[in-house]
């Protein structure tokens, strides 16, 4: 599943294609959304927001399209009139004079009013987004030490969208390697220095991945700073200590770590 940096990059691509342009055609696959088609023609997308792995497309009439890609959903940008060759099922089409954005295969799609936006169950549940520029290491540290999270093992906590939205497995693996910890630690047991390092890494690594065009299927980004230090590198030497990186399973997900420098 794409993680926060990939979702934000997808949002950037959608904004670049149609933001501020009048919609000339709107189509939804689901019957409960059909009534919104005519309401949106002539309106425009004001901005595309991410909340962890959910995407919010805001329209000029106050409505917001909520979509969560889950495992299979994918957005595409095409020239208007172009019909991509794909076996995927089209769910949403938002068309402008020159560009069209298409959502395929997703099933978790809703139209929300401003009031519904504040009460939506998923949006209520997710924690602060790691890519929100207003989120600080101090706030992250407070969350780590809060009664709700301080006794949770990092193996599960760093996958829990209620803790911080936008984290996922490759980020969990890279963050824990960066701070030299294994997944069985809890925030309540860390030293002040370890807590500080973790709070910074929880923001720095997702933001670096986003800023340097972090693609999960590329091991190295040409000319960029972000690359996987342990993710998908089992059997290779750790660049920090030389020990061989191992692969195991933590919280039902593949976990990569260095037994030499993660304790």
From Swiss-Prot:
Active site location: 2-3, 53, 253
Keyword entries, A-Z: DNA damage, DNA repair, DNA-binding, Glycosidase, Hydrolase, Lyase, Metal-binding, Multifunctional enzyme, Zinc, Zinc-finger
Catalytic activity: 2'-deoxyribonucleotide-(2'-deoxyribose 5'-phosphate)-2'-deoxyribonucleotide-DNA = a 3'-end 2'-deoxyribonucleotide-(2,3-dehydro-2,3-deoxyribose 5'-phosphate)-DNA + a 5'-end 5'-phospho-2'-deoxyribonucleoside-DNA + H(+)
Record-linked Gene3D superfamilies: 1.10.8.50, MutM-like, N-terminal
Cofactor comment: Binds 1 zinc ion per subunit.
A GO biological-process term: base-excision repair
GO molecular function terms listed in the Swiss-Prot or TrEMBL record: class I DNA-(apurinic or apyrimidinic site) endonuclease activity; damaged DNA binding; oxidized pyrimidine nucleobase lesion DNA N-glycosylase activity; zinc ion binding
Zinc finger (FPG-type): 229-263
Cleavable signal peptide: none
InterPro entries in alphabetical order: DNA_glyclase/AP_lyase_DNA-bd, DNA_glyclase_Znf_dom_DNA_BS, EcNei-like_N, Endonuclease-VIII, FPG_cat, MutM-like_N-ter, Ribosomal_uS13-like_H2TH, Znf_DNA_glyclase/AP_lyase
Entry EC no(s): 3.2.2.-, 4.2.99.18
Descriptive protein name: Endonuclease 8
Source species: Escherichia coli O17:K52:H18 (strain UMN026 / ExPEC)
